[in-house]
Design a protein with these regions (language model features):
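Residues that flank catalytic or metal-binding motifs in active/ligand-binding sites
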Residues: 28-30, 49, 57, 95, ...
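Extracellular, beta-strand-rich glycan-interacting domains
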Residues: 30-40, 97, 145-171, 181-190
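Aromatic-rich beta-strand patches that line glycan-recognition/binding surfaces
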Residues: 33, 43-59, 137-138, 167-171, ...
Length: 222
């Protein structure tokens, strides 16, 4: 298997303290990828949404919002939150879903990929984004907006990954790929420290120790 262990980050979060702020304080182009799984995106999420990655009010990848079911993807970004309510299907439960967000202020394109397929795109990107402060995995605005489930393979790029690149690398990627700013596999299996595999030094420490879950990905066909 390519992935043998993942982190359950229920009621947990990971502040992102960038080693080199200059790499993230004016990103005109960004791709964010994550592999996530939840047994229930909606239960107990009454006034909360589920945060994957980003900075509140600037650029934030999350699941759910007040205007939509709690299982629908949404990205907060310059140009307005996207996609709109009920434009895309909700995420499935009890299975890993690969989510990729591409924001490109040079072309204007903002896209959402689910399991390697582009399911939404518009042309509303306007300006560079700044991730240098108040950036988190699993936290935004207030502590209730944690991610209810497992996370793996979180990657932040300063390039627009293509549909083909996104579809072909859900479970692993070369840590020295061009444009890869941070790569957190969340496969440590012990403790609360998450290593940035790029060598760029953006290691994370959880607010608490995550629950480590054994998995087998990709799942072998029975």
């Amino acid at each position: 298997a390519l992935i043998n262990v993942v982190a359950n980050i229920d009621e947990n979060y990971f502040p992102v303290y960038w080693k080199d702020y200059s790499k993230v304080n004016s990103l005109r182009v960004i791709t964010v990828e994550a592999l996530v799984r939840s047994s229930d995106w909606t239960d107990g999420r009454d006034n909360a949404l589920s945060t994957i990655f980003g900075v509140e009010g600037e650029f934030l990848v999350r699941i759910g919002d007040g205007d939509r079911p709690r299982d629908q993807y949404q990205c907060v970004a310059p140009g307005g939150n996207f996609p709109g309510a009920n434009v895309v299907d909700g995420l499935p439960v009890d299975e890993f879903v690969h989510i990729a967000t591409v924001y490109n202020a040079d072309t204007g394109e903002r896209s959402y990929y689910k399991n390697g397929e582009k399911v939404y795109s518009d042309n509303s990107a306007t300006r560079a984004i700044d991730l240098s402060s108040s950036c988190y995995i699993g936290y935004s605005w207030e502590p209730g907006r944690w991610l209810p489930g497992e996370i793996s393979e979180v990657r932040v790029w300063n390039v627009a990954r293509t549909a083909e690149e996104i579809a072909s690398n859900p479970y692993m990627v070369d840590p020295h790929s061009e444009g890869l700013i941070a790569y957190w596999k969340f496969n440590e299996g012990t403790g609360s420290k998450i290593i940035d595999h790029t060598g760029n030094g953006n290691d994370l420490t959880g607010n608490t120790t995550p629950t480590w879950i054994n998995v087998e990905l990709p799942e072998l066909k029975k």
